[in-house]
Amino acid sequence: MREPKPQEDLQAIIDDIYRELTPRLGEGKVADYIPQLARVDARHFGMAIVTTGGEVYRVGDAEMPFSIQSISKVFTLTLALGKHGENIWNRVGREPSGSAFNSIVQLEHEGGKPRNPFINAGAIRISDLILAGHTPKELIGEIVRFVRYLADDENIVIDHEVARSETATGYRNIALANFMRSFGRLDHPVEHVLGVYFHHCALAMTCSQLAKAGLFLAAGGTNPLTGHSVVSRQRARRINALMLTCGHYDGSGDFAYRVGLPGKSGVGGGIMAVAPGKASIAVWSPGLNDYGNSLLGSLALEMLAARTGWSVFGP
């Protein structure tokens, strides 16, 4: 890829990235353990950038909705921190797991307390925490409204076919929830907690919507497009820190090394990344690498960081 020019236009950069990756579209393996996701064409690719100054840049399939899956865990964590504050860390840790996102081994070794809120067990525990005082249906509605508020877009919905598909085949997540319940780590019935979890993972968003929803994390906790204050500057910084260290499962270290941005991936092929003080980025390419993260999405973000100098570790 050619060297960046001073003040190079972001649209030109992502156009170049898309052009360079086009011959590789379809690489990676689509998640096949969720039947609805297995049907997605691996050749899709979309990318959107929303800057803190309000500029929006798009390329490829940036306006095509996809299942955000584990990216939704950033939003439920934000809700949990708003409801329970720092007390949530008594129930879930803040350390990278070094294990697969759906591993049960570490959970047993550590008494049913999940390592962090971004692995499946941790996100299930977060769903349990924010379920307090709600029925599952009420909480699912609150999560959807919150994400719409973040993105300033009322068109964001849950893909109920994906939710049903996950509910019917999510045996490992059912096992994780029951395992935590056996340790006294869940406060609500397993089926209620998983109902919330499966539905928030089934949120369908475009790259443009997702980049807008994550913009508060790039701008010190306030969405500069809407003026909505979401979290404090300190809390935004801490959520970004967790995304950097834990946002890509057992591939988090590799992503930090190659990209150097806080980010959260999902097995639907999406990644939401944050360049603090500069922009929020969303990329989607369904083919996954061995860690369960988007293969070309990760590469696109690596290229973007190299061209812009946006890595938090320096240009």
Curated annotation (Swiss-Prot):
Pfam families: Glutaminase. It is an enzyme of class 3 (hydrolase). Its EC number is 3.5.1.2. Substrate binds at residues 70, 120, 166, 173, 197, 249, 267. It catalyses: L-glutamine + H2O = L-glutamate + NH4(+). Keywords: Hydrolase. One of its GO terms (molecular function) is glutaminase activity. SUPFAM superfamilies: beta-lactamase/transpeptidase-like (SSF56601). Signal peptide: none annotated. Belongs to the glutaminase family. PANTHER family: GLUTAMINASE. Homotetramer. This is Glutaminase. It comes from Rhizobium meliloti (strain 1021).
